[in-house]
């Protein structure tokens, strides 16, 4: 049987380089990925290297608040 709370939560990863450069969100947009993480194994914010189609390279994508 399942335990009380679900450990897996859905998180959104956003390109930190696009945000830092101040890209206009309406016209160009910011690269975002949706993934899941286990709250018990990784309680801190998640950071992964993913491909950013706006920057045309692999950059660090950090977890943002919903």
Swiss-Prot record:
<dbReference type="GO" id="GO:0005840">
    <property type="term" value="C:ribosome"/>
</dbReference>
<keyword id="KW-0150">Chloroplast</keyword>
<dbReference type="GO" id="GO:0003735">
    <property type="term" value="F:structural constituent of ribosome"/>
</dbReference>
<keyword id="KW-0689">Ribosomal protein</keyword>
<dbReference type="InterPro" id="IPR038584">
    <property type="entry name" value="Ribosomal_bL33_sf"/>
</dbReference>
<dbReference type="InterPro" id="IPR011332">
    <property type="entry name" value="Ribosomal_zn-bd"/>
</dbReference>
<dbReference type="GO" id="GO:1990904">
    <property type="term" value="C:ribonucleoprotein complex"/>
</dbReference>
<protein>
    <recommendedName>
        <fullName>Large ribosomal subunit protein bL33c</fullName>
    </recommendedName>
</protein>
<dbReference type="Pfam" id="PF00471">
    <property type="entry name" value="Ribosomal_L33"/>
</dbReference>
<dbReference type="InterPro" id="IPR018264">
    <property type="entry name" value="Ribosomal_bL33_CS"/>
</dbReference>
<keyword id="KW-0934">Plastid</keyword>
<dbReference type="InterPro" id="IPR001705">
    <property type="entry name" value="Ribosomal_bL33"/>
</dbReference>
<keyword id="KW-0687">Ribonucleoprotein</keyword>
<comment type="similarity">
    <text>Belongs to the bacterial ribosomal protein bL33 family.</text>
</comment>
<dbReference type="GO" id="GO:0006412">
    <property type="term" value="P:translation"/>
</dbReference>
<dbReference type="GO" id="GO:0009507">
    <property type="term" value="C:chloroplast"/>
</dbReference>
């Amino acid at each position: 049987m399942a335990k009380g709370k679900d450990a897996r939560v859905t998180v959104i990863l956003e390109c930190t380089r696009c945000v830092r450069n101040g890209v206009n969100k309406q016209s160009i947009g910011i690269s975002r990925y949706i993934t899941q993480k286990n709250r018990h194994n990784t309680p801190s914010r998640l950071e992964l290297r993913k491909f950013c189609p706006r920057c045309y390279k692999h950059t660090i994508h950090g977890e943002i608040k919903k």
